[in-house]
UniProtKB/Swiss-Prot annotation:
The keyword Protein biosynthesis does not apply. It comes from Homo sapiens (Human). It comes from the Eukaryota. The chain crosses the membrane at residues 68-88, 161-181. Belongs to the FAM87 family. Keywords: Membrane, Transmembrane, Transmembrane helix. It is a multi-pass membrane protein. The gene is FAM87A. This is Protein FAM87A. It is found in: Membrane. GO terms for cellular component: membrane. The keyword Transmembrane helix applies.
Amino acid sequence: MTGTLERENWISGGKSLVLRKQHPGPLRPWRKRAAQLGGGCGWRTAVAPAKFCLWYVVPSWLWEPPGYLHSSLFLSILFQVTLLETALQSRPNLSLPLVRCGWACTQAMSTRSNCGSRSFLWAQTQADAASGLPRSRLGFLGLGGCGLIVKHGMTLRNWASFFVVFQAWSLMILQVLGDMLNIYYAYIQATLTLKVDVAPRLFFPEGGALKEHFSSMDSFQLREAGGTRIPRPALIYGRAVVTRTVTKAQSLKSALAWAALGCKHPVLSTLCEESQQGAWSEFRRF
């Protein structure tokens, strides 16, 4: 063994140590040929349609995307890009100009397939415009973003994979942003409900000799009611009525607390200015 290594080292001129390679085996030439072709043989061809289901169908089950993403034009183009990746992933030497040409053909085929239903597209466009959603053709703007990001020497397989993943993550990001906006609106609504409905019940416990009456017209009033309710309700925000019976010791404290809590919100700020002034006037009188 030592003599063999020394002889091979002498033949190579002392620059490298040449070791004998093992037999490649029956399957290794096929694997080498598949690697030279770009890996487009075998199970990779069947995986590409599964990519479409994994990156679009499954997220659409988990998170409902906006309405314009359900259009037939957008889905057909996205699916044809996946098929384009499947058909041409065995040719890794194609550059970006051919990719752009193939994308133009795909767009033309998708537009031609949908030209027969012009009335449906017009009705869908009108419905999207009425609901405030962007048109389905705005989905092509993602192509311009991909064209600016990808390099000139990028192969079609890498570009198509990048585009599919980019579109899938764009759908998910759009849906997450929509959920965040919905949560923010729900938070505002819950805050208004807390300040208008829950806070008066906390600061105005039932059972007492005094009643506090808030209104935008007659501001804040302390009346000796003796347990009877004020006949005319006070409207502050919608149908929210703040008329609660409190004890004499809690009247001023609850009034100032309600004024401070309500005036923090811009909607209620103009409505509780008079209440705050009335509370300070009653405080000076007290």
